[in-house]
């Protein structure tokens, strides 16, 4: 007696799809957070290079090469977001054709749950860390220069990409996955090609 003959195969496919869907937002948010960190380090290295090589820049007598910094930020933004874009577009066909329409529905449901939860968490946590730093800088809990301020700066360093990059990207992620799923829905097998 197989699972499919008892009608349980679709239940397991739906659960597998939901599990995959819940994992995708966490994967995408980790990629976007790493992308922000990598771009920041590239920018820091460029600024240090300019301070070393452009004479008079430290004293304020020379102008920095701001075009190079803009180029680094633009290139990093475009290149580092290719992988999340590919994942968002490729996962619905992979799940839909591989496991079937039922699993794809589960993936979208799980993706929606994961995206909403992460977006709310990241927007609120990022805003809280940002405001905590501002609160400490107003003189509370020791003010600027204290250990509390140093900890608040670290929190704000994590909080800014949370609320400005990873949180908003969850909306785009679930929208793209849903649109791609709608486009391919008429082509999907009910049961899938793999199982």
Where are these predicted regions, by residue range?
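Terminal amphipathic helices with adjacent charged low-complexity linkers/tails
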Residues: 20, 38-45
């Amino acid at each position: 007696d197989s699972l499919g003959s008892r009608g349980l195969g679709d239940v397991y496919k739906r659960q597998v799809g939901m599990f995959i869907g819940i994992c995708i937002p966490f994967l995408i948010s980790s990629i976007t957070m790493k992308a922000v960190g990598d771009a920041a380090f590239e920018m820091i290295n460029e600024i240090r290079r300019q301070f070393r090589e452009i004479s008079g820049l430290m004293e304020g007598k020379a102008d920095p090469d701001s075009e190079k910094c803009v180029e680094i930020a633009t290139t990093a933004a475009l290149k580092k977001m290719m992988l999340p874009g590919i994942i968002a577009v490729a996962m619905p066909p992979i799940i839909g054709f591989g496991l079937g329409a039922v699993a794809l529905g589960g993936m979208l449901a799980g993706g929606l749950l994961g995206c909403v939860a992460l977006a709310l968490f990241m927007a609120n946590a990022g805003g809280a860390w940002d405001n905590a730093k501002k609160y400490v800088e107003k003189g509370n809990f020791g003010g600027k220069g204290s250990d509390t301020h140093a900890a608040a700066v670290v929190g704000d360093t994590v909080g800014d990409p949370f609320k400005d990059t990873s949180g908003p990207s969850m909306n785009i992620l679930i929208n793209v996955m849903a649109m791609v799923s709608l486009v391919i829905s008429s082509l999907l097998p009910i049961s899938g090609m793999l199982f």
